[in-house]
């Protein structure tokens, strides 16, 4: 049987287990964009902020979409995932149809001219990062699950249900976990 951690690679979803109660990651869904011997990097998908992109990111004054908390690392940096690697220079493909980064000025131009739609991009403040071996240790103590990613999940605005739907999609015993109350002691 393959160890769950051995399935981890760029383009997979990282789901906080029900045991992970740390506030930065409780019931989060992350997309892993980089995973190698040096560590891992990803973005939290289900933590929209109260700020809109137009209020916080220079050059994107027309974008009324929410800015997302990508994670607790370098929260003074802005990152983006998008589906238009075919027209954005410097983008890194995460899986077919999903790209990370690229030329920010080009993205601004494409959005402002309507060539690219806001629904094709998601902006993040900061990122989630793990040093070499750190994420593996967290797996060993049961902090994370791995699931398949899709563009539908990445660009979904069903933030409240994203974690339970993603956990439930794993099937079997995970369906019970997905339905567990957030604070079982209050039942």
UniProtKB/Swiss-Prot annotation:
Gene3D superfamilies recorded: VC0467-like
Pfam families: DUF179 (PF02622)
GO cellular component: cytosol
HAMAP family assigned to the protein according to its UniProt record, in alphabetical order: UPF0301
Family (UniProt): Belongs to the UPF0301 (AlgH) family.
PANTHER family: UNCHARACTERIZED PROTEIN YQGE, UPF0301 PROTEIN YQGE
Protein name (Swiss-Prot/TrEMBL): UPF0301 protein Cpha266_0885
């Amino acid at each position: 049987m393959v160890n769950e951690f051995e399935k981890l690679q760029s383009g997979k979803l990282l789901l906080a287990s029900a045991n992970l109660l740390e506030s930065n990651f409780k019931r989060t869904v992350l997309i892993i964009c980089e995973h190698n011997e040096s560590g891992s990097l990803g973005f939290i998908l289900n933590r929209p902020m109260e700020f809109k992109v137009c209020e916080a990111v220079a050059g994107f004054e027309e974008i009324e979409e929410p800015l997302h908390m990508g994670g607790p690392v370098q929260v003074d940096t802005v990152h983006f995932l998008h589906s238009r690697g075919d027209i954005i220079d410097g983008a890194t493909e995460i899986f077919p149809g999903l790209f990370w980064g690229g030329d920010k000025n080009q993205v601004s131009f494409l959005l402002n001219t309507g060539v690219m739609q806001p629904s094709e991009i998601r902006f993040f403040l900061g990122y989630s990062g793990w040093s070499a071996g750190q994420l593996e240790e967290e797996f060993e103590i049961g902090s994370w699950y791995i699931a398949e990613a899709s563009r539908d999940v990445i660009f979904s605005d069903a933030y409240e249900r994203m974690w339970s739907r993603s956990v439930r999609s794993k099937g079997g015993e995970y369906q019970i976990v997905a339905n567990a109350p957030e604070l079982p002691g209050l039942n």
